[in-house]
Amino acid sequence: MRQVFIVPDLIGEPLDEAQGALQSLGSQSLDPQDASGLGRSVSIDGVWRVCTQSPKAGEVVDVRTVVILAAVLSGERCP
């Protein structure tokens, strides 16, 4: 039987909390990216805040689906 989960709305969440939420649902693959376009290395901690996500909230996906979270440093505006 295929294992799936419903993608939660992670926009505005600290990146570490977003990762925890995904892992609790069974997600096995996360790709954090710098939403600013500056190509900075993104660490999974509370210093980064999620701006966009793919797949979108509400989509039903396989646990092996790569979830892309584009984030900016806390205090920065999302592009």
Which residues fall in each region the model found?
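Ligand-recognition elements built from short beta-strands and adjacent flexible loops
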Residues: M1-P79
